[in-house]
A protein has these predicted regions:
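An anion/pyrophosphate-binding glycine-rich loop and adjacent beta-alpha core
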Residues: 37, 211, 217-314
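N-terminal Rossmann-like FAD-binding beta1-loop-alpha1 element of flavoenzymes
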Residues: 7-31
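Glycine-rich active-site loop/strand segments that organize a redox cofactor
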Residues: 51-83
Length: 314
């Protein structure tokens, strides 16, 4: 590790890793991972990546509209346009880099359906897409001569300097290091771990939000926290094992304690309504039945299909 870099990236999930690869070999980059990079929140993502790649059956305008509806039209339109318009080329780039998205015999990427989407536009690698993406990117990033990669290192301060930033780090050996950089990218992910129960990795503690605020950034919509509706029941465990959105995309239905479907009673989109809507439906049904027992039923699919499509969950 050097004393000065052109760019320091705080966070080693998909965003941080992919961002590191956007710089030329002449620019020095430092990527800092709070723990072993293999345990990022991105590596836990199961379902896949939404992108309009099937122009015959899908359209970017539909993807934009789906996103606006899911966000109750409080979204940032410019951010949505970037997501929708740049997403397809980024997915194709990931494939070029070596990510093996599930494909048919002809090589065409398979796309599934997920909640909030009106079309099949989710590319995936079985039910561990995040791991497939991050494992590929980690290998490439670590091979780059212009990129230094440090793991098990906690960034505790990001301060303005005359020509950039100072980054304060607590290393794995408990020593403290400070490096300077011209530019700093905060890619630290979400804040799921501040809640009692979560499917998030232990590192999702909102560090980047704090750094940005301390540097003068204006924060908004901090109440818009996304909760995943489905996880394995584990009463004594804070960490819950995620059951992918894609399971419902493949037709799984939610059942209450009486074995009855109920999601459609709260929203006509049923199990494929946006996550906040499905989560609210589960809570309201729990209050109605005075029970916290719920089931996700995919028995209409064969065991072989479930084993092949969702090997990690199985």
């Amino acid at each position: 590790m050097k004393e000065n870099y052109d760019v320091v990236i705080v966070g080693s999930g998909a965003a941080g890793l992919y961002g590191a690869l956007q710089f030329s070999d002449k620019q020095s980059v430092l990527v800092i991972s709070k723990r072993n990079a293999e345990f990022s929140n991105s590596s836990l993502a199961q379902g896949g990546i939404a992108a309009v790649l099937d122009k015959e059956n899908d359209d970017p305008k539909l993807h934009i509209e789906d996103t606006l509806i899911a966000g109750k039209y409080k979204n940032n339109p410019k951010a949505i346009e970037v997501l929708v318009n740049e997403g397809p080329s980024d997915v194709l780039r990931l494939r070029e880099l070596g990510v093996e998205f599930d494909s048919d015999p002809s090589g065409k990427m398979l796309m599934t359906l997920e909640a909030g989407h009106s079309r099949h536009r989710i590319v995936h690698h079985k039910d561990f897409t995040g791991k497939a993406v991050t494992d590929t990117l980690i290998e490439i990033v670590k091979s780059k001569s212009n990129i230094d990669f440090v793991e098990d290192t906690l960034v505790f301060s990001v301060d303005k300097a005359q020509n950039g930033f100072y980054i304060g780090m607590l290393n794995s050996d408990h020593s403290i290091t400070t490096v300077s950089c011209s530019y700093c990218i905060l890619a630290t992910g979400g804040i799921g771990r501040v809640y009692k129960y979560t499917t998030n990795s232990a590192i999702a503690t909102g560090d980047g939000i704090t750094f940005a605020r301390n540097l003068g950034a204006k924060l908004m919509h901090l109440d818009r926290i996304q909760f995943h509706p489905t996880a394995f029941a584990a009463e004594k465990d804070r960490e819950r094992f995620l059951i992918s959105e894609a399971v419902r995309g493949e037709g799984a239905v939610l059942l209450n304690c009486y074995g009855e479907r109920f999601a459609q009673n709260y929203d006509e989109r049923g199990e494929l309504a946006p996550r906040d809507v499905v989560s609210e439906a589960i809570i309201r049904e729990s209050m109605r039945t005075n029970s916290e027992n719920f089931y996700l039923d995919i028995t209409h699919k064969s065991p072989d299909f479930v084993r092949e499509r969702f090997p990690m969950i199985y």
